[in-house]
Amino acid sequence: MEVLWMLLVLLVLHLSSLAMSLSTCKAVDMEEVRKRRIEAIRGQILSKLKLDKTPDVDSEKMTVPSEAIFLYNSTLEVIREKATREEEHVGHDQNIQDYYAKQVYRFESITELEDHEFKFKFNASHVRENVGMNSLLHHAELRMYKKQTDKNMDQRMELFWKYQENGTTHSRYLESKYITPVTDDEWMSFDVTKTVNEWLKRAEENEQFGLQPACKCPTPQAKDIDIEGFPALRGDLASLSSKENTKPYLMITSMPAERIDTVTSSRKKRGVGQEYCFGNNGPNCCVKPLYINFRKDLGWKWIHEPKGYEANYCLGNCPYIWSMDTQYSKVLSLYNQNNPGASISPCCVPDVLEPLPIIYYVGRTAKVEQLSNMVVRSCNCS
């Protein structure tokens, strides 16, 4: 009995020490973090350009060809446009949602073949019952099993959303894909996240996709494609006996409703302004500003443009969602015992990185290069 009591005391002390280690962090030396980041960038740039040492040249004394300047500015424009498009398509809360586990659903399609158009009909009410609010939707994919063909011809297929509005049927173009001849059956998929997101806002009982050849020519061979779950276009009914696991279906991943409170709470924290995130004393995992001046910080004269750039870095706490009074504490205790040097909490790491175009000199030759993954735009807990 006394031995059992001693073991219980030791267990309580162990859990207490583990809880303390999870709730406290060492003070961060911001200047040391900055120095390490600068040195890492020095090595990154030289490594990406495959340079053993820095070029011994002063770019300010060189006349840069107009072609190089034009190419550099064009590259900058492309990067900015791409960043703008991605910001529009990906919500600010996407990083938070990506961290949490998703529930996976599979919804089988009711298929119909009409005038060389494959129709995929879904019970939208059933989708709404399972997924819930559109804010919980993470990803939706329309998948179909394409059968092998002996036709040696590429075929471009176009996907449409067929929907009803005010008693009228409308078609909205979504995407097109080139179907190439294959010797084996294979799966084909379309990203329909945006469309399903709209389904969740509507009240229609059924929703439908249509897949049809882009070519309207009368040649039968140009329209010869077989998808499992449909009667073959040649008129036979062989495809009707398709296997259950190869019928067209909609795969959806969504955030379980019980986790939405955590995401909402994180949104509120991230929505209080840049000062909250960019302050060096901010507690959350987010982007910290770091401007690199090539001449001042690295002592380099061989890079002509830009003179410096916003490199940034990630720092801050990540959410720890397990409490010490749950079964997870035992798992974490064992993990910590077997991996004493490893972190048992998520780490704050770069999530979205952008390239950096530069004009630099090797000898008397001006070059324009794009260095990948040099600018940290957002951070995530991983």
Curated annotation (Swiss-Prot):
Any single biological process term in GO: positive regulation of cell division
SUPFAM superfamilies named among the record's database cross-references: Cystine-knot cytokines
The keyword Electron transport appears for this protein: no
Molecular function, one GO term: cytokine activity
GO (cellular component) term, any one: extracellular space
Stretch list, region Arm domain: 66-263
Pfam family, one: TGF_beta
Glycan attachment residues as annotated in the record: 73, 123, 166
Segments for region (Straightjacket domain): 22-65
InterPro entries hit by this protein: Cystine-knot_cytokine, TGF-b_C, TGF-b_propeptide, TGF-beta, TGF-beta-rel, TGFb1, TGFb_CS
Signal peptide as annotated in the record: 1-21
PTM statement from Swiss-Prot or TrEMBL: Transforming growth factor beta-1 proprotein: The precursor proprotein is cleaved in the Golgi apparatus to form Transforming growth factor beta-1 (TGF-beta-1) and Latency-associated peptide (LAP) chains, which remain non-covalently linked, rendering TGF-beta-1 inactive.
Disulfide bonds: 277-286, 285-348, 314-379, 318-381
Location of the motif Cell attachment site: 234-236
Location of region: Bowtie tail: 218-242
Keywords tagged on the record: Cleavage on pair of basic residues, Disulfide bond, Extracellular matrix, Glycoprotein, Growth factor, Mitogen, Secreted, Signal
Protein family (similarity comment): Belongs to the TGF-beta family.
Assembly behavior: Latency-associated peptide: Homodimer; disulfide-linked. Latency-associated peptide: Interacts with Transforming growth factor beta-1 (TGF-beta-1) chain; interaction is non-covalent and maintains (TGF-beta-1) in a latent state; each Latency-associated peptide (LAP) monomer interacts with TGF-beta-1 in the other monomer. Transforming growth factor beta-1: Homodimer; disulfide-linked. Transforming growth factor beta-1: Interacts with TGF-beta receptors (tgfbr1 and tgfbr2), leading to signal transduction.
Function: Transforming growth factor beta-1 proprotein: Precursor of the Latency-associated peptide (LAP) and Transforming growth factor beta-1 (TGF-beta-1) chains, which constitute the regulatory and active subunit of TGF-beta-1, respectively.
Protein name: Transforming growth factor beta-1 proprotein
Record gene name: tgfb1
